[in-house]
Design a protein with these regions (language model features):
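Pocket-flanking alpha-helical
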Residues: 47, 64-102, 195, 216-220
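Short, well-ordered beta-strand elements
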Residues: 28-42, 59-64, 154-158, 269
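A conserved helix-loop-strand patch within extracytoplasmic ligand-binding domains
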Residues: 103-158
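Short, polar/charged alpha-helical segment
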Residues: 41-60, 172
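Ligand-binding pocket segment of bilobal, Venus flytrap-like solute-binding proteins
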Residues: 80-84, 157-235
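A bilobed periplasmic-binding-protein/Venus flytrap-type ligand-binding module shared by bacterial periplasmic
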Residues: 116-128, 247-261, 284-285
Length: 316
């Protein structure tokens, strides 16, 4: 498809949602919009933020706990309606695999750029606990600084839940750091932040998985600098895993029927584009201020009404 026909197709889709003269959109279905929740704060808060916007527009909403990788198949099959935080590095392959089968569409990209990587809290660098950081080669000689009670004298990297990345980090550690390092998997994102608090209190260094945008952007977090990522460098893609993570996009996905069943909600969803500060602030309401995910969403919606209400009007 050339650029001209692509523009024609895009215009045709837009005209099915609203005419340039401001014609009222077809009424959204009363069928609930099903929004998934996963296991990190910004995603759950944003689920309730988006659900709150849909409800303000008069829609019915349901929330379901969903597997972070399997959710794209659920969207394709129509069991889930949308996904609002599709992180390129972790979920890109599952996203595109479901799209290739049919039934899932790309609903746009957030303004925020992402990085999913291991690193250390800023105070580890400030206290020079491992000289040479953030260069990954510094870890080769200071593994003992990152040893914990369950690491057998080896340096420990605390990864997120294994369902997020599979063997990506064990493969990388084996390829670049060797036998003096071990990867342990946290049960949840909350376990990562609890380890940060405990490590600082105990005066020990810690090396954990993290991502940006996140609430830690404000507190300070230093990502390890590995050899540059290139397509196919990971072992799971046929490479040797001697590479770091790519900087990537943050997309939204939807079931292909969503634009027809809920044209107004889909138009609003396609317009939603949150930046790093906005996403980090959603997470901070939970991870720093201690609100529940639902209360955090309510607070965020109240504080940012001008931002989200602009996404819900008719027109281009």
């Amino acid at each position: 498809m050339n650029k001209f026909t692509s523009k024609v197709a895009a215009a045709a889709l837009a005209m099915t949602l609203a005419s340039v003269s401001g014609q009222t959109l077809a009424a959204d279905s009363t069928k609930p919009i099903v929004i998934p929740t996963h296991n990190w704060s910004s995603q759950v808060v944003m689920a309730y933020v988006i659900g709150g916007i849909f409800e303000d527009m008069g829609n019915n909403v349901e929330y379901v706990s969903a597997d972070t990788q399997g959710v794209y198949e659920s969207i394709r099959n129509g069991d889930v309606t949308i996904s609002h935080e599709v992180w390129q590095s972790t979920f890109g392959a599952s996203f595109y695999a479901a799209m290739a089968k049919g039934g899932l569409i790309d609903a746009g990209t957030h303004a925020a750029l992402t990085l999913e990587e291991v690193g250390v809290p800023q105070w580890v660098v400030d206290n020079d606990m491992c000289p040479g950081l953030p260069d990954y080669t510094a870890l080769i000689d200071c593994y003992a600084v990152f040893a914990t009670a369950d690491s057998g004298g080896k340096g420990r990297i605390l990864e997120g839940p294994q369902s997020w990345h599979g063997t990506e980090y064990p493969d990388r550690v084996e390829a670049l750091l060797g036998d003096n390092w071990v990867v342990k998997f946290a049960g949840s994102a909350d376990a990562l932040w609890a380890d940060h608090v405990a490590a600082e209190k105990e005066g020990r260094a810690t090396l954990t998985f993290n991502w940006t945008p996140n609430f830690t952007d404000g507190a300070g977090f230093v990502f390890i600098e590995w050899p540059e990522y290139y397509l196919g460098c990971r072992k799971q893609d046929g490479g040797d895993s001697k590479c770091g993570s790519p900087k990537g996009w943050l997309k939204k996905a939807a079931n292909y029927k969503f634009p027809k069943t809920h044209p107004a909600a889909y138009m609003a969803f396609s317009r939603m584009s949150f930046d790093a500060g906005q996403i980090g602030s959603m997470a901070a309401l939970v991870d720093l201020e201690g609100l529940s995910h639902k209360d955090a969403a309510t607070q965020w919606l109240a504080d940012n009404e001008d931002t989200w209400r602009a996404m819900t009007g008719v027109g281009m």
